[in-house]
């Protein structure tokens, strides 16, 4: 009921599409499920909150959003054809100048995978879907002049440019010579990344999650979870996921809504 009340508050304030805050239903089921919970918190902190404060759209995901009937009437119904319907619908809203509002007090709980291999398959599908949306919607968004459309265009361009970024990074390391590939330099780089990621994860866990929902194994493994996005994104550029496969969710005995 809290989700419906807070969503209705946003509609009464003038929002047409509302995205609530998402948490893992089973954050202590495994380190993988706990990493999803941390990822959602980080995404809200660094993506949704700044965009909400700046008058831009937050990002829809498949769980926990609501839309006004007039939006479907304006867009001619729900017309999505990619593997990432949420991203495609977000792009359609941006093209039409419809802002997606963020309501952090409208909370939904989503059961997450507990195995890393399953997580890789799910996130590969997400990455592939966003690439599909980009190839479908970028030409249309580039012809729009509004801030919402340009912000979405930048979001969809990011995965398209991932291979270029990886090549430029590799080229810069080659130009730096042997010093860039020395064991000491590689170890220092890896240590800095790991400390930064675990530090962020620990802060998110302590600040945003009560003691009963804290999974410290997830904090230790969060750098691996985040690093795995890059190969998944690169793979999605060259190997499309076109068939939906069921993602097992088997953490039902570890639900914690505290």
Where are these regions (language model features)?
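C-terminal catalytic/acceptor-binding lobe
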Residues: 88, 104-130
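Catalytic core of nucleotide-sugar-dependent glycosyltransferases
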Residues: 38-45, 120-140, 200-203, 232-237
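Membrane-embedded multi-pass helical conduit in multi-pass membrane proteins
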Residues: 155-240
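Long helical/loop segments within the catalytic core of UDP-sugar-dependent glycosyltransferases
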Residues: 2-76, 80-82, 124, 131, ...
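Active-site-adjacent helix/loop segment of glycosyltransferases
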Residues: 118-168
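Catalytic donor-sugar/metal-binding loop of nucleotide-sugar-dependent glycosyltransferases
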Residues: 81, 90-109
């Amino acid at each position: 009921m809290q989700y419906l009340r807070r969503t209705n508050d946003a509609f009464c304030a003038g929002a047409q599409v509302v995205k609530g805050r998402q948490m893992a239903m089973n954050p202590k089921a495994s380190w993988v499920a706990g990493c999803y919970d941390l990822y959602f918190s980080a995404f809200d902190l660094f993506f949704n909150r700044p965009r909400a404060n700046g008058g831009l759209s937050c990002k829809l995901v498949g769980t926990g959003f609501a839309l006004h009937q007039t939006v479907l009437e304006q867009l001619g119904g729900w017309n999505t054809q990619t593997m990432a319907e949420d991203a495609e619908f977000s792009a359609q809203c941006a093209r039409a100048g419809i802002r997606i509002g963020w309501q952090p007090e409208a909370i939904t709980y989503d059961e997450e995978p507990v195995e890393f291999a399953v997580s890789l398959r799910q996130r590969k599908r997400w990455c592939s879907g966003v690439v599909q949306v980009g190839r479908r919607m970028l030409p249309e968004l580039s012809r729009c002049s509004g801030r919402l459309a340009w912000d979405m265009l930048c979001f969809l361009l990011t995965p398209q440019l991932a291979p270029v970024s990886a090549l430029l990074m590799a080229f810069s390391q080659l130009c730096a010579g042997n010093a860039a590939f020395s064991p000491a330099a590689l170890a220092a780089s890896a240590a800095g990344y790991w400390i930064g990621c675990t530090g962020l994860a620990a802060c998110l866990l302590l600040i945003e999650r009560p003691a009963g929902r804290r999974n410290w194994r997830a904090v230790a493994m969060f750098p691996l979870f985040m690093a795995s996005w890059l190969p998944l994104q690169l793979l999605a550029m060259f190997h499309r996921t076109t068939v939906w496969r069921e993602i097992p969710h088997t953490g039902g005995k570890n639900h914690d809504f505290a």
